[in-house]
């Protein structure tokens, strides 16, 4: 148990009370505690004892009792009458003891929290100690006046109690002063925030709160567009955001926009997908198509004879064409050689079947010749950069095919070859091309005629027609034979499908088709072209008007 400020006060008050209590219980209550002794007589607060005989307990001395003690006025400092009057004041001893007892109880209660921190409580104790001290002091003075010069130790203990009460008063005053000072300091601290450090702590807390406080993120401003119409099937639309969608024209934008403007405007238009390109258009030294101005005036087919029907319109589709199939047969990519379109080969493999009469294989790029193909109509070209010629018994005229006719759906499996066509209502000469939209046709020049024997082919050492291209993966040899060497009128092979490949048979034999076959060219061109077979002494590159490179 820790000592508290009220503990010393309690101890002092206890001692003072004991001393005052001893003075109260003196003779005749306790014969061993006399206030004064003279001539074998012991004096106390409530009587005296003489030769062992004590008087009854009462307050004060009478004249008879004083005379019976045998004392005279010369024995004490006061006369007998004064002593008799003062003897009644001895009652202050029990009063002083009682007051001291009350102060002792209050000091003991000051150990509690509420009384010890109450200035008013300590003030009440201090006020009560003051009369206690005065009563104790009065008791000591009475003893001095009555019993001097025969005062005994019982009278002196009252003096000790009085001194202790004075000390208790000082301690009580100090306790209260300490408590009041503490409360006053707290009050001043409460009134002055800078003195108490409250402002400092407030600033620290505010700074910490500012650091810990998360700053709100400003929402990103977005441009909103309210939808004009909303369908009942869709949910509620709060905002619609603008998106950049690619139009269908983006797929038709040319990749190379730095080509010759004249060639783009008047000629080939940089091969924009969907533009019709003549099937047998002349090309320059590097395999690129010439502008229309360079070849529109020239005949499209360089074979002698009267002008034939005009070329078919690009909008007219082949009667057997399928939009789900790949690009037209032998339609090679533009450039100098390179790989063919994806889709595999025709029924006869990469070399296809025999040619029809007077059909030619126009070059689509630099490199070797694709060679004839076995089987029916030739499929897409092999990796070499050339497209094969239409096989014997092919269907429809050679015409310019637009890429939009096939929908860019990629090559599909080859469909069955259609059967013979019904005879037209007004049959014309054999070999007359069917024209849905007649167009004017220019008269071919005689200088463009090239003998069939002068047309050379690229033939390897084993008499097999192969493409010769730096990027081709299917070239066997690097042997070169002039391209139009075997284009003379020869007997065609039979049109029977799936015949085994016979390299020793003639390559350009005309097939004996039935009466329902319609040739792509007029017989006039065929007859005139056959007359020039024997002139094989002049190379094809030196023939005037020849555009094949």
Curated annotation (Swiss-Prot):
Basic and acidic residues bias locations: 314-325
Region (Disordered): 226-549
Transmembrane segments: 10-30, 89-109, 122-142, 144-164
InterPro entries to which the protein is assigned, alphabetical: pH-response_reg_palI/RIM9, SUR7/Rim9-like_fungi
Keywords, ordered alphabetically: Cell membrane, Membrane, Transmembrane, Transmembrane helix
Record bears the keyword Cell membrane: yes
Biased composition (Low complexity): 379-388, 418-431
Mode of membrane association: Multi-pass membrane protein
Comp. bias regions, Gly residues: 335-355, 365-378
Localization: Cell membrane
Cytoplasmic side: 1-9, 110-121, 165-549
GO cellular component: cell division site; cell septum; growing cell tip; plasma membrane
Residue ranges with Polar residues bias: 227-246, 469-480, 491-515, 526-549
Keyword Metal-binding assigned: no
Segments on the Extracellular side according to the record's topology features: 31-88, 143
Effect annotated for changing residue 47 to D: In palI30; largely prevents proteolytic cleavage of pacC
Biased composition (Pro residues): 304-313
Free-text function comment from the UniProt entry: Required for the proteolytic cleavage of the transcription factor pacC in response to alkaline ambient pH. Might be a pH sensor.
Annotated PANTHER family: PROTEIN DCV1-RELATED (PTHR28013:SF3)
Family, per entry: Belongs to the palI/RIM9 family.
Protein name: pH-response regulator protein palI/RIM9
Organism: Emericella nidulans (strain FGSC A4 / ATCC 38163 / CBS 112.46 / NRRL 194 / M139)
Gene: palI
């Amino acid at each position: 148990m820790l000592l508290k400020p009220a503990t010393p006060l309690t101890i002092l008050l206890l001692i003072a009370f004991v001393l005052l209590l001893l003075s109260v219980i003196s003779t005749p209550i306790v014969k061993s505690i006399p206030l004064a002794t003279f001539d074998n007589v012991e004096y106390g607060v409530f009587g005296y004892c003489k030769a062992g005989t004590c008087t009854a307990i009462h307050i004060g001395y009478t004249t008879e009792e004083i005379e019976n003690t045998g004392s005279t006025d010369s024995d004490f400092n006061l006369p007998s009458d004064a002593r008799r009057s003062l003897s009644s004041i001895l009652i202050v001893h029990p009063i002083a003891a009682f007051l001291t007892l009350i102060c002792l109880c209050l000091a003991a209660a000051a150990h509690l929290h509420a009384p010890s921190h109450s200035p008013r409580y300590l003030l009440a104790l201090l006020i009560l100690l003051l009369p206690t001290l005065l009563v104790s002091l009065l008791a000591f003075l009475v003893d001095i006046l009555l019993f001097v010069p025969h005062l005994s130790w019982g009278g002196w203990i009252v003096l000790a109690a009085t001194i202790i009460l004075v000390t208790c008063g000082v301690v009580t005053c100090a306790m209260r002063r300490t408590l009041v000072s503490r409360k006053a300091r707290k009050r001043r601290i409460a009134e002055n925030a800078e003195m108490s450090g409250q402002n400092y702590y407030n600033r620290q807390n505010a700074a910490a709160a500012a650091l810990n406080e998360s700053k709100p993120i400003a929402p990103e401003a977005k441009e909103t567009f309210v939808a004009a119409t909303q369908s009942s099937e869709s949910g509620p639309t709060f905002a619609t955001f603008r998106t950049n969608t690619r139009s269908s024209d983006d797929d038709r934008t040319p990749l190379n926009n730095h080509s010759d403007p004249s060639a783009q405007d008047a000629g080939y238009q940089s091969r924009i997908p969907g533009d019709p390109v003549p099937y047998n258009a002349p090309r320059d030294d590097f395999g690129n198509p010439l502008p229309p101005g360079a070849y529109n005036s020239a005949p499209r087919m360089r074979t002698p004879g009267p002008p034939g029907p005009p070329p078919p319109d690009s909008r007219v589709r082949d009667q057997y064409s399928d939009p789900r199939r790949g690009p037209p047969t032998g339609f090679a990519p533009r450039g100098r050689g390179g790989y063919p379109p994806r889709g595999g080969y025709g029924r006869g493999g990469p070399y296809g079947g025999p040619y029809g009469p007077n059909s030619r294989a126009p070059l689509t790029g630099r490199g070797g010749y694709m060679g004839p193909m076995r089987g029916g109509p030739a499929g897409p070209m092999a990796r070499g950069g050339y497209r094969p010629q239409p096989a014997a018994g092919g269907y429809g005229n050679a015409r310019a095919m637009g890429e939009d006719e096939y929908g860019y759906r990629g090559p599909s499996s080859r469909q069955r070859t259609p059967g013979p066509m019904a005879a037209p209502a007004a049959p014309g000469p054999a070999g007359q091309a069917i024209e849905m939209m007649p167009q004017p046709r220019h008269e071919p020049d005689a200088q463009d005629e090239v003998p069939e024997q002068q047309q050379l082919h690229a033939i390897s050492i084993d008499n097999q027609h192969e493409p010769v291209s730096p990027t081709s993966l299917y070239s066997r040899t690097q042997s070169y034979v002039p391209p139009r060497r075997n284009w003379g009128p020869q007997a065609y092979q039979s049109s029977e499908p799936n015949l085994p490949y016979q390299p020793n048979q003639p390559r350009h034999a005309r097939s004996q088709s039935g009466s329902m076959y319609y040739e792509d060219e007029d017989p006039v061109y065929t007859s005139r072209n056959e007359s020039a077979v024997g002139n094989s002494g002049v190379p094809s590159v030196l023939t005037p008007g020849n555009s094949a490179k």
